[in-house]
Design a protein with these regions (language model features):
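A short, N-terminal "cap"/entry segment at the start of jelly-roll beta-barrel domains
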Residues: 1-42, 49, 122-144
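Short histidine-centered beta-strand/loop micro-motifs
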Residues: 30, 42, 49-54, 71, ...
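Short strand-connecting beta-turns/loops that link adjacent beta-strands
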Residues: 35-36, 74, 100-102
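Structural motif
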Residues: 38, 59, 66-68, 92, ...
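Short, conserved beta-strand element in jelly-roll/cupin
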Residues: 43-45, 53-69, 109-112
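Surface-exposed, flexible loop/turn segments at secondary-structure boundaries
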Residues: 49, 67, 75, 93, ...
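Short acidic-glycine-tyrosine-enriched beta hairpin
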Residues: 73-89
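Ligand-binding loop in jelly-roll beta-barrel domains
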Residues: 89-119
Length: 144
């Protein structure tokens, strides 16, 4: 990742690089990765069971597709492209893709940076042994 004080990204180009299929729940591409915050683009391939993050707050913008988003004890809420959800650390949440819809792609910011192992499933059996994330090959920031 380029350590400049600023970067420009072509999100459409990054989205086009996501594979059609993946064994992991998501495939992501880091846009920034600093102690104070990290930002990523990720595509959802399989349901993400209810889980939490102990070390970071999360800010998610759904760029494409539709998902059913479960949070805390509320019934799942349908999110559509252009909608955003934010929540603090230790809030249980899960994401279910909508069958037959466009692939769900999110822009996310974690504050502070989420440690790689900070994904704690409420019921580990629900993950069915599926890996949480696969990283897209490093994306080089390009200045405009």
């Amino acid at each position: 990742m380029d350590e400049k004080a600023y970067n420009f990204f072509d999100l459409a180009e990054i989205k086009a690089r996501f594979p059609d299929r993946a064994e992991s729940m998501i495939v992501d591409a880091y846009l920034s990765d600093h102690e104070s915050a990290s930002s990523r683009l990720f595509r959802l391939y399989h349901p993400i069971p209810r889980h939490l993050h102990e070390t970071c707050d999360e800010h998610l913008v759904l760029l494409d597709g539709e998902v059913d988003f479960a949070i805390a004890d509320e019934p799942p809420r349908r999110l559509r492209a252009g909608q955003m959800v934010t929540f603090l650390r230790n809030i249980v949440h899960g994401i279910q893709p909508v069958e037959g819809g466009a692939p769900a792609v999110f822009f996310t910011v974690d504050t502070p940076r989420r440690a790689p192992g900070d994904v704690h499933f409420v019921d580990s059996a629900e993950s069915k042994g599926r890996r949480f994330v696969t990283h897209l090959a490093s994306y080089e920031a390009r200045s405009a």
